[in-house]
Every structure is written in C-alpha cells, then in structure tokens.
Amino acid sequence: MKFTESERLQQLSNEYILGGVNSPSRSYKAVGGGAPVVMKEGHGAYLYDVDGNKYIDYLQAYGPIITGHAHPHITEAIQDQAAKGVLYGTPTELEINFSKKLREAVPSLEKIRFVNSGTEAVMTTIRVARAYTKRNKIIKFAGSYHGHSDLVLVAAGSGPSQLGSPDSAGVPQSVAQEVITVPFNDIESYREAIDYWKDDIAAVLVEPIVGNFGMVMPQPGFLEEVNKISHDNGTLVIYDEVITAFRFHYGAAQDLLGVKPDLTAFGKIVGGGLPIGGYGGRQDIMEHVAPLGPAYQAGTMAGNPLSMRAGIALLEVLEQEGVYDKLDQLGRRLEEGLQKLIDKHHITATINRIYGSLTLYFTNEKVTHYEQVENSDGDAFAQFFKLMLNQGINLAPSKFEAWFLTTEHTEEDIDRTLEAADYAFSKMK
C-alpha cells in the first residue's frame, strides 16, 4: 500500500498541530514511529484514507463506534437535530429521555449528570466522593487509564502503603500525594492499602473489566471483595465504565458481573460517536452536586441536544434483539482463528477476549495483571501492527490497546483479517 498523501499531510500537520496529532495515542511512536495514516471517511466497519486505501477497522476510534462508522439511524438523528439547533444553554426534553433510557439499562444510576468527556466524568466522581466522605485520598489500580486530569496521572509508589508520584510533567507532587496505586486483581494489596490509610480514603476507582491494558477480566470474587473492604471502611466505590458501558451487553459491565458501585463514570459508546461523558449513582451521594449540594460541576456543552439525540439513537440500535450475540460470535470466530494461526506459526502470543473485544499480547502467559502487558514484546507487536496495516487492517498503534468489533463487521471481514494475520505471522518467524 502507498501512503504518499498521508505522509505529505502529516508533514503539513506538524507545522500547525503540536506533534501533528490532537491526542498522543494517534501517533505511531509506540510502534516505531512514522507518519500515521490520515483517514478521509468511514462507513460501517471500514475506513478509507487520503490515498484511497481501504481498511477493516478494529480501532473504532478507541472504542466509541460500536455501531460502525456513519450508521444510518444515528446519522439521520444527528442531521435532524443539527437542523433544529445544536446548543441552547437550557434544559431539553432530550436530556430527560436519554437519562431515562440510561437508568433503565443501568439501575445503579439513580441520578445522572452529563459532561463532555470521560476525563470530566471521572474527575467529577472523585470530587463528589470527596465531598460526600469528607476525605481526600483515592486508590486506583495500576495500568488503568482514567483520563488526563491531574489526580489520575499518578504512578504507583513502591507498595500499597506508599504514595504515588506524578506520571506527567505539570502534575504537582502535592496532588500525587493524594493517590495510592495498587495492582489490579491483587486483593491483598488492596486490603493492605485500606488497612494502612483507613479513614483517609474517600474512594477507590475501578475499571470493573479492564480496557486500558487490553481486555482483562477481574478474578473471581475480586470486585465483590473490593466492595466489602471499601464499604467496611466508609470508602466509596467508583466504577470507570467509560470503555465498558454498553460494550458487552445492553447495560454496564457492573450488571453483567453482578456487582454494584456507588458511583459510575461513563462515556465513549453512549455518545454515538459525538463527544460525551456522564456520571451517576446513589441519590444520597449525587445530591452533594450543585445546585443541590456543595460539590460544583458545570459545563456549557454538557447535555447538549446533538449529543443527547445521538445517544438516544445509539441505544435504539443496541437494544435490538441479537446485537450482542452477533458481536460475541464474531469475536469468537476472530479469537479462534488467531489462535490457530499462533499455533501454526509458533508465535509467542496469547489472546484475551471478552465478547466482541479482544487483545493480542505477545507474551507466553495468560494476562491478568498490568506488569505482564508492560513486559510483553513491544517490538513484535510493532512488527505485527505494520504488517497488518499494509494489508488494510487498522489496529490501535499500541500493545496496550484492544481490538473492537462492531455491529457492521461480517464473517467475511473476520476471514480477511485472518488471511492478513497468517501472512503477518509468517513474516515474523
């Protein structure tokens, strides 16, 4: 494949846009560099770049596009609303209707507020938890990404009793001192952190199913024990479901797993491809948010009519019968096909799949912890990524990211992807 126009546009982009991209994950730095492909349009499961190349897309904008690009029902809803106005600065009936559908699907969302991104949603749940508990510190799990606000860009200390350190320039050490990071799926480390810090801990921030170092399930009993230990300590449980809400079934991962948090942050999928974030939870906690309570959160674009209309249309597609069964079937076909090819070519790799999402790790052990992904073979992934890209398969340019299937992928798309993987693996020997 030729990428002449992408390379030209990337050089031009570097003149005007810092680093040539508006989010660092879009660069190819993690796969050895080079100009990222510049896309022109998307339809269904496919993307088309400025050089005219066609791709089967498993990036899906890092997760939001579960119904594929330019889904007719969602596109029609957006166009119709745009003709009526995109922003009023007043309450709308659309906000009410969307909130109602979300609470019907996720019962723990007793009260809901909308924001504009997952970062805002998580940031605000932490503020609300602090207001409710009158405590300051939070616990999070290593490897989970919760947005780019200061409080969650904190690296782990040397153990559960140790405070974190800034994971980005510009994050004050004083902020990092409010965060304790422990390993996911390690309940004893979590218990040790709670026992040490006790009433300092306002909340624990959890991805109930991890989506930020690939797709990783909680070990049996882990989430239940986190809930018990937390509540015994007066600590709130916040679920970051920005990736997982409506990913695996019509609802949130918490309902699939049978574990209920106190607060939930959501985003990505529920916006139907438009910017969105939201949070909600127990009414007695949510009532601490302005205008009813002292915890302030506001936003000019929050609950804007365009995103609300797109979100409603998105849920109307996902609530149809058989949607998630199809995603699971396609995911299984892709997983089983990749595994056969791994065995055929004697590739050191393992697969984690959860319904219609999966991650291919270049390591010889089943992945349950962040350190395993960190230590996996990044060079092998980079080689695989480029070999797949050159055959028209678009993956996330990072060994930490997942592959996402959509309602628009077909068995033929899976088979074509497996043909590409067969070739890629043959070149990696």
UniProtKB/Swiss-Prot annotation:
GO biological process, one term: protoporphyrinogen IX biosynthetic process
Major subcellular location class: cytoplasm
SUPFAM superfamilies assigned to the protein according to its UniProt record, in alphabetical order: PLP-dependent transferases (SSF53383)
Top enzyme category: isomerase
A Pfam family annotated for this UniProt entry: Aminotran_3
Keyword Isomerase attributed: yes
Keywords associated with the record: Cytoplasm, Isomerase, Porphyrin biosynthesis, Pyridoxal phosphate
Listed PROSITE patterns: AA_TRANSFER_CLASS_3 (PS00600)
InterPro entries for the chain: 4pyrrol_synth_GluAld_NH2Trfase, Aminotrans_3, Aminotrans_3_PPA_site, PyrdxlP-dep_Trfase, PyrdxlP-dep_Trfase_major, PyrdxlP-dep_Trfase_small
GO terms under cellular component: cytoplasm
Cellular compartment(s): Cytoplasm
Cofactor(s) needed: pyridoxal 5'-phosphate
EC number of this enzyme: 5.4.3.8
Family note: Belongs to the class-III pyridoxal-phosphate-dependent aminotransferase family. HemL subfamily.
Subunit composition and interactions: Homodimer.
Name of the protein this chain belongs to: Glutamate-1-semialdehyde 2,1-aminomutase 2
Gene (UniProt): hemL2
